[in-house]
Curated annotation (Swiss-Prot):
Effect of substituting residue 51 to R: Results in improper protein folding but does not abolish chitin-binding
Gene transcribed to yield this protein: ECP6
Gene Ontology molecular functions: chitin binding
UniProt record similarity statement: Belongs to the secreted LysM effector family.
S-S pairs: 36-90, 64-98, 109-163, 168-220
UniProt effect for mutating residue 206 to K: Does not abolish chitin-binding and stiil suppresses chitin-triggered immunity of the tomato cells
InterPro entries cross-referenced by the UniProt entry: LysM_dom (IPR018392), LysM_dom_sf (IPR036779)
Stated name of the protein: Secreted LysM effector ECP6
Keyword presence, Cell membrane: no
Residues modified by glycosylation: 89, 95, 127, 133, 222
Residue ranges of every copy of the LysM domain listed in the record: 42-86, 115-160, 172-216
């Protein structure tokens, strides 16, 4: 799932300088009006660090306009070295129609593990609760030592509420392959992004490399005991 395929999870990331190819007589680059109001397209070669957000901003385009023109299957993934057609200078850019908004968590505990999480740069309790698929209130309730939920420190260890009578069927090592994202691994192996992050605190999810080894919990669930 991810080598030098860029992590654009949440479609966020720093913009970097890429390669802009001049307009040609290629039919894909011909001057024509688009849904976003652009009358010109350019070819752009994706470089390390690019995201659709940064590219759209660079050329005053729309994330979903780029997705549409290039028929991209997943707006969260763009391949290093790929050539994209970019409708530039959009008067009505579309940055929402192709981006799904995750549902608010309703669970109050995490099945299996872990019981704690170490804060890293950029974390907020809101984002952490979403990564673990639990409500913000349940995370705050499990950490009464935190006086201000909006003020957490890098390196601080917080409690993650774990469901009683729950387990992960396996916790083992996994080697990253091309295209891997924590969000996809979580869905495939029935765990959460937060659980993967907690067990790989020194791993940057946006800089995964092919062959990199991570710890991966699998099939995390509540366990029901049959009544005789």
């Amino acid at each position: 799932m991810q080598s030098m395929i860029l992590f654009a999870a949440a479609l966020m990331g720093a913009a970097v300088n890429g390669f802009v190819l001049p307009r040609t007589d290629d039919p894909d680059c011909e001057t024509k009006a688009t849904d976003c109001g652009s009358t010109s397209n350019i070819k752009y070669t994706v470089v390390k660090g690019d995201t659709l957000t940064s590219i759209a901003k660079k050329f005053k385009s729309g994330i979903c306009n780029i997705v549409s023109v290039n028929k991209l299957a997943n707006p969260n993934l763009i391949e290093l070295g790929a050539t994209l057609i970019i409708p530039e200078n959009c008067s009505n850019p579309d940055n929402k129609s192709c981006v799904s908004t995750p549902a608010e968590p309703t669970e109050t505990c995490v099945p299996g593990l872990p019981g704690s999480y170490t804060i890293v740069s950029g974390d907020t309790l809101t984002n952490i609760s979403q990564d673990f698929n639990i409500t913000l209130d349940s995370l705050i309730a499990a950490n009464t030592q935190i006086e201000n939920p909006d003020a957490i420190d890098v390196g601080q260890i917080i409690t993650v509420p774990v469901c009683p009578s729950s387990q992960c069927e396996a916790v083992g090592t996994y080697n990253i392959v091309a295209g891997d994202l924590f969000v996809d691994l979580a869905a495939t192996y029935h765990t959460t992004i937060g659980q993967i992050k907690a067990l790989n605190n020194n791993v940057n999810p946006s800089k995964l490399k092919v062959g990199q080894q991570i710890i991966l919990p699998q099939d995390c669930k509540n366990v029901t005991t049959a009544v005789a």
